[in-house]
Amino acid sequence: MSGRGKTGGKARAKAKTRSSRAGLQFPVGRVHRLLRKGNYAERVGAGAPVYLAAVLEYLTAEILELAGNAARDNKKTRIIPRHLQLAVRNDEELNKLLGGVTIAQGGVLPNIQAVLLPKKTEKAVKAK
């Protein structure tokens, strides 16, 4: 016989994703596939997609945390593009990273030039 159906063999271990091995939520396998299909290089190492997935996950978590804070400040429970815009533009490093990015339906940061603000009079200063 061909040897199929024997009962003495070991059961195959449950498959474990590379994302779970790395402790990530982002899909390492999908990132690897996209790196291979994207013609970025002839070959892609095993560690490259893990590292890239970790970086993407970190940036996403950072933006979502700041956007969640912006939503909470506006007494909202759902993050909308406006909250993403406020989160990115109020953070110096994220603003530099995403400087050339336009967020649809994001609006603009509120900003009034100092010369347009009402002047403080002496009475207002003494009242304090």
UniProtKB/Swiss-Prot annotation:
Top-rank lineage group of the source organism: Eukaryota
Cross-link for Glycyl lysine isopeptide (Lys-Gly) (interchain with G-Cter in ubiquitin), residue positions: K14, K16, K120
N5-methylglutamine: modified positions: Q105
Biased composition (Basic residues): 7-19
Modified residues (N6-(2-hydroxyisobutyryl)lysine): K6, K10, K37, K75, K76, K96, K119
Modification sites for Phosphoserine: S2
Cited SUPFAM superfamilies: Histone-fold (SSF47113)
Organs and tissues of expression: Expressed and secreted by skin epithelium.
Sites of N-acetylserine modification: S2
Any GO CC annotation of this UniProt entry: nucleus
GO molecular function, one term: protein heterodimerization activity
Family affiliation: Belongs to the histone H2A family.
Biological role: Core component of nucleosome. Nucleosomes wrap and compact DNA into chromatin, limiting DNA accessibility to the cellular machineries which require DNA as a template. Histones thereby play a central role in transcription regulation, DNA repair, DNA replication and chromosomal stability. DNA accessibility is regulated via a complex set of post-translational modifications of histones, also called histone code, and nucleosome remodeling.
Protein name as annotated: Histone H2A
Naturally occurring in which organism (per UniProt): Oncorhynchus mykiss (Rainbow trout)
